[in-house]
Amino acid sequence: MIVSGTQVEHAEYGIGTVLAVLGDVATVEFFGEALDVVAGELMPRQQSKQAAPPPARGQTSTDFAFRKSFEAVNLGVVPTDPDQLVDLTIGGEQASDEIGSLLANASEDGVCRIFMGYYGSGKSHHLHLVKAVAIRDGWVTASLELDPKAADPAKPATVYQGLVGGLEFPMRADGSRSADFFDLIKEIRDNWSVVRDLPYFKRSPWFSKGLEALLYLSHRRDDTDYVAAVSWLAGQVKQIGAIRSLSWRGGHKTQIPILPQTKDTGLIYAYNLVVLHEILKALGYKGLALIIDEAEHVRSYSFNRYIRANNFFDIIARCAHAPRKDLQKPQSDYEHFDLPPFWKEGPHFTLFVGLTEGEDTHDLKRKMGEMSVLIHDPKDVVHLEPPCESDYEKWCEAFLAESAGRLGPKVQLLADPGLRARIAATLRHHFDQTPVSERILRNWTKIAGFAPAVLMSRDGATNSDELVELIDEAARQIAGEMLPWDD
């Protein structure tokens, strides 16, 4: 019988708790949302002696987060929930501790880490882990994937625009959180007396004059003209007319300079990122963490674009390292702006880059204009490799145990520790048979989710031997031990 407080499962909405029953309609809380459903569509959760313990009161949101992360693993993408991301990363606790330690010493030692590996080695996953740890530790992150058609390092204005558009903020002590660059402008306005005298900020004709102009206007998200003016400061260079005309009408008469976008502009946009880092620190954040993936795109560039892209890489890498005296002044086509020598006054922001292995990454002593301008020291490079067999097996068992406790009664077969051990051992065996260079980690984490996925997709009962047989056959295919059409 279904009464208030009963834990139930719905075929479409998943696991929930009955809040009230009125006739044939039950109000059920599914993962934090109350829905009215037909009572006959609900199945009470039956707990066997071997079943994993049900979630404690208040854990519904955790179950929901795991379900979303489980689906992400099955799709081969990175889970979005930071806590789940650490938990579902093989060696996640150790990796997060290492990242946290780097960030803690960033202001003195600088942080520039290049995650290298071939396709499927986990570069993007590690960068997502960096973002999760950085936000947890009070850093504001700016992340993007380089793209020759959108965020092109040969056109630093597009990279700057993408990074500012990808800002993510940690939660404040009072529970508030800025959502984007527009909210950051509100924070700056509220703390203008702190921001206006910052040394790099004062030397930036774009930030100093642009923000002074915005102070003459009301900060309103529903004012499209004002939003356009703010977007100019966020890298929408064509909105210069919006901020100039609005501020002029508001009483601000100082000429606001354009943000250049042609020729070599790397120095200008690197400086704007330094200013942004300075502002964030003044507002109480730990600073700015840049996270850039797909950096290998520049290999296909023409000569001039290649040089400009790597000049930009060179400058932001210097900003993330402790200063060096043996480097020449960076190239710039806009020296008349008279910027301070910020590239040798750091470290400033932190920098994390995902880079696919290539010939230009093997020689760390190459000259300016090569990919290795990002690398100042061999310790900057983290070569990603698949985990060892024992670590993979332990992770599979832990993942299956979490699935048994959080994915509902259909996967209660996995509550049996013996079955979980058999499945994990089966996966380890085939993982071990695969050459290290061919172990695409995303495939081997996806196959671990195959067992609960099979149970959740079937209406009838599946016994343990049948499930292990299905897992074994699928793992053989992933390991390349058989072709899909082989018997």
Task: Describe each model-derived feature in a short phrase.
Residues T60-F66, A242-R420:
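The catalytic "switch" region of P-loop NTPases
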Residues V133-D152, D380:
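Conserved catalytic segments around the Walker B and adjacent sensor/switch elements
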Residues I15, L19-A20, V25-E29, V37-V38, ...:
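A short, basic N-terminal segment
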Residues W192-A270:
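Conserved P-loop NTPase mechanochemical-coupling segment
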Residues A154-G175:
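Conserved NTP-binding/hydrolysis module of P-loop NTPases
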Residues E108-L129:
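Walker A/P-loop nucleotide-binding motif
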Residues V227-R244, K367-D487:
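C-terminal alpha-helical "lid" subdomain
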Residues M1-A11:
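Short coil-to-beta transition motif at edge beta-strands of beta-rich domains
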